[in-house]
A protein has these predicted regions:
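Flexible, non-catalytic linker and terminal segments flanking ANL/adenylate-forming cores
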Residues: 1-45
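Structural core segment of the AMP-binding/adenylate-forming
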Residues: 1-5, 9, 14-18, 118-211
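Conserved AMP-binding A3 loop
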Residues: 73-75, 223, 231-258
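Conserved S/T- and glycine-rich ATP-binding loop of Class I adenylate-forming
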Residues: 77, 99, 116, 147, ...
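Conserved structural elements of the adenylate-forming
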Residues: 80-83, 213-216, 246-268, 274
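Short hydrophobic alpha-helical segments of the AMP-binding
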Residues: 109-117, 123, 253, 260
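Conserved pre-ATP/AMP-binding loop-to-beta segment of ANL
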Residues: 197-235, 242, 266-274
Length: 274
């Protein structure tokens, strides 16, 4: 067995620049910037998925996710994203279709977040703590057509009812046990059976994750305009009334990612832990 040495990763360069006096008079907040941040950095405008795709190409064998002990490499997740993207297209998802995520932090969230954006669809995040009334209100407000959720009693029954109460058209179910490592994937159904929902597999509006991704992963390319196309709709906390959907373009979200990378992430590329 030949063990390959991991690729050498160049440390992030931090060029210290100091804004001129005239600049700080016009933009006084520049004085508060950390010295390591290049205040005049040009932020690239790209589709959000491009950031992931570049990382997957550069670090295919590095671990991207560690979910309760089950590890996924960038290559693993990239394959799932590609297949999920084509699967979404096969059920009618296209550019600007609203794809809702009613999920906790889990691998399925990452897969569908990027799969939907890759084909130009718009993600709508739903808190898994929402009551049925809140779910229905947000589905109607966002015009969500497809919902992704887990096969848990706390989540799935709420969403299945929405097929009759709202304009929701499809549900994609990601079984939790399929995302767990051995032996948790065996023990969970045995000891937590009451927490697992009965899925309406005979209903054509309900699709299982493994069936959706049973394809070659070659989705039809979709042209995305970073400044114009909405990547996701993120709802506010609703402290002053009902939550309001904030429409975030690909350009705005990628800008935020690059800014966070410059200002907060001090590790070398691919070494960060979140």
């Amino acid at each position: 067995e030949v063990k390959k040495s991991p690729p050498k990763i160049a440390a992030k360069s931090a060029v210290k620049t100091t804004p001129s006096a005239s600049m700080t008079q016009t933009f006084p907040w520049l004085k508060t910037y950390p010295k390591e941040i290049k205040w005049d950095t040009k932020i690239p405008e790209t589709p959000l998925y491009d950031i992931f795709e570049k990382s997957a190409a550069q670090f295919p064998d590095r671990h991207l996710i560690d979910f309760l002990g089950k590890k996924y490499t960038y290559a693993d997740v990239s394959t799932l994203i590609d297949r999920a993207a084509k699967g979404l297209q096969s059920i009618g998802v296209q550019k600007d279709t609203r794809v809702a995520l009613f999920l906790p932090n889990c691998p399925g969230f990452i897969v569908f977040y990027y799969a939907a954006m890759k084909i130009g669809a718009t993600i709508v995040n739903f808190s898994p703590l929402y009551a049925a009334r809140e779910v229905a209100t947000q589905i109607e407000d966002s015009n969500a057509e497809v919902m992704v959720t887990l096969d848990l009693e706390a989540l799935y029954p709420k969403i299945y009812k929405m097929l009759e109460r709202t304009e929701l058209k499809k549900i994609i179910v990601c079984p939790l046990k399929e995302q767990l490592p051995f032996p948790k994937n065996i023990l969970f159904p045995l000891f937590k059976s009451k927490e697992i929902a009965k899925i309406h597999t005979q209903d054509e509006r309900v699709l299982m994750f493994k069936d959706l991704i049973n394809n070659d992963g070659k989705a039809k390319p979709v042209k995305i305009s970073p400044r114009e196309d909405v990547a996701l709709i993120q709802y506010t906390g609703g402290t002053t009334g009902l939550p309001k959907g904030a429409r975030l373009t690909h350009a705005s979200v990628t800008a935020n990612a690059h800014q966070a990378d410059m200002g907060f992430l001090k590790e070398d590329d691919s070494q960060e832990r979140v």
